[in-house]
Each structure stands twice: as structure tokens, then as C-alpha cells.
Regions:
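Phosphodiester-processing cores and adjacent nucleic acid-binding clamps
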Residues: 1-134
Length: 134
């Protein structure tokens, strides 16, 4: 990629190609090929992807845990950090209403989202991912 130098490329949330490839059960070879492009892999709290349970893409919270564990494993295989993030779309929880209002007329509206995408400190992220270990 011509302009990649100096950039940090992250794998993104469930809409990113790495998570999507893990979700779709791509082969280990294909997963490594896709993930090798990124500098680090993002892990979201389960509640961020709870909609995948609601729309029946996955069957259980354990399935969501498995997806995150696979992302961590993939990072280890490629010597890339897997980082707990929270897909921040606004800074403070009280800004959620403004964001929902702006999204209401778009295809991206997500009523009833379990965890609004505001900034969460490290302690909160660790609280939501104990199954990944220390």
C-alpha cells in the first residue's frame, strides 16, 4: 500500500473484514492472510456485539466469547496485539441521545443497543472481558 508508512491500521469492529472472516469461519490460512494487513486486532465487549444474538447470527454469548478468543489467538499467531476497545462514537454517555437522533434517519440506527458506544476506561473493558484472561 503506497501510503501505509506511518499509519496504524486497526481491524475494526464487527463490520471489519477480520471479525467478519472469523464470524464466517474462514480457514486459518485465509484468516492469517486477512489479519496480517493490520497492526492490531480489536476485541469488543460482548454487549457491543449482542445484536448478533438478537438477529440470530450467533447462538449464544459463548459463541461471542469464542469469536473474541479466536481474535486473540489470531493475534498471537501473527505477533500482533489484540486490544480491548469499545468502538467509541462519542465521549460521554449523555451524548448518546444526540447520536441516536442523528442516526434515526439512517440505516445505521441501532435502537436498544446494549452498550452505547461511548468512551470506556480500561477498568470497564477489563470487567467486560475476564474470559480472555489477564
Amino acid at each position: 500500500m503506497e501510503y501505509r508508512e506511518g499509519l496504524i491500521i486497526v481491524s475494526a469492529c464487527e463490520a471489519g473484514e477480520v471479525f467478519e472472516a472469523v464470524l464466517r469461519g474462514k480457514s486459518d490460512t485465509e484468516l492469517r492472510r486477512i489479519a496480517s494487513f493490520y497492526d492490531y486486532l480489536e476485541i469488543m465487549p460482548l454487549a457491543n456485539n449482542h445484536f448478533l444474538l438478537d438477529n440470530r447470527t450467533v447462538r449464544s454469548e459463548e459463541s461471542l466469547r469464542h469469536l473474541n478468543r479466536r481474535l486473540v489467538q489470531l493475534g498471537q499467531e501473527l505477533a500482533k496485539p489484540a486490544v480491548a476497545t469499545c468502538a467509541v462514537h462519542f465521549l460521554d454517555p449523555d451524548q448518546e441521545l444526540l447520536r441516536r437522533t442523528l442516526l434515526a434517519a439512517t440505516a445505521f440506527a441501532a435502537p436498544g443497543q446494549a452498550i452505547p458506544p461511548y468512551y470506556r476506561p480500561t477498568a470497564d473493558l477489563l470487567h467486560h472481558t475476564p474470559y480472555l484472561g489477564p
